[in-house]
Amino acid sequence: MKQLLITTHLYTFAVICVIATTISSCTFKKKTDMETPTGTKENELTMLVGTYTSGDSKGIYSFRFNEETGTATALSETEVENPSYLAVSADGKFIYTVSEFNNEQAAANAFAFNQEKGTLKLLNSQKTGGEDPCYIITNGNNVITANYSGGSISVFPIAKDGSLLPASDIIKFEGSGTDKERQEKSHLHCVRITPDGKYMFADNLGTDQIHKFIINPAANAENKEAFLKEGSPAAFKVKAGSGPRHLTFSPNGHYAYLINELSGTVIAFEYKDGDLKEIQTIVADTVCAKGSGDIHISPDGKFLYASNRLKADGIAIFSIQPDNGILTKVGYQLTGIHPRNFIITPNGKYMLVACRDSNVIQIYERDADTGLLTDIHGDIKVDKPVCVKFIPNPKQS
């Protein structure tokens, strides 16, 4: 695998002030005489943005984001190829990313993260053994990737210094689906650990399945125990041609919601003790674009959001019935082009949408009562943004 070259460049945040109806936006401007902003203020989060690097992007960008004012300040840029998905360790000290390639360059990368400066330092990289890793998570002892074209998931034990050991397990899936173009074989698109920490689900877009695994929480780099064991049942089947993409859980852990890329539907499940019971299917993509993308729930658990791409790009908005998890569509917010990923601030006030083909992250203020979104016209300019993560920062003393 080609060695990753990592360099951190420091940048300032260029602020364009506006008058009347002129839209304000922010972009990167290289620092010359100023040091990187250090320390954090109340209500500030560190924001990391993963990108595709086929254009002008260098890799990962970091910002301070104020979750009360909706303003961002650029911090740093880190060179790494195609970091299309990111995972953050529980203590915020380490960042794990994929390098999404359809060849032997496909990798998982480990970085040490400086929370004060917002900078990353590459620790090491390991081959995934499966092409196009597109999703990555960590439980603290292991890192797991979903490898789209490889039709597999890879497990990497974490060393004491936060770096990754070679893959301890690569689990490959067979099978196909009814869509001959998109489901010609297995395509793993997401891995999620259940709220109780006992199980892991893996979404297989190619076979219309959610694979189930039992987690061994004791598995780590030292004891070399297997992290995953096939569950019973081994998988949950959804309607043919759905194309499972991303899965999320309600804050109370009682419900799971699946966005299907091909059918454009959201499936609601009751979740209990490793089992999924389907309770509802509702349409998010009404124009049949076969491009549904990401799914998230507001921190208060009252609203669910699902992104759609390729046609009528935007965010479908649903209310959640608290006593049974049933969804009701309440609105639709048009966005920039190709909203592959989005995130909601921990306080629930803002949604940030990574619009890959508009080369911006759009910022929307969220109405806590209706769930509806309002564009504040504070776009953050980043080339091909496809993943946004927040890291809470300690308050300054």
Q: How would you name each of these model-derived features?
A:
Residues R64-T69, F111-G118, P157-L165, I214-F227, ...:
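Short loop/turn segments immediately following beta-strands, especially the blade-tip
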Residues A74-G140:
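Blade-loop segments of beta-propeller domains
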Residues T73-T78, K121-Q126, G175-E181, G231-K237, ...:
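A short beta-strand motif characteristic of beta-propeller blades
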Residues S292-N324, Y332, I337-I344, V353:
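Loop/turn-rich, solvent-exposed surfaces of beta-rich toroidal or solenoidal domains
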Residues M1-K41, S397:
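Bacterial Sec-dependent N-terminal signal peptides
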Residues D56, V80-A90, G129-N142, E174-D196, ...:
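Beta-rich, blade/repeat-based domains predominating
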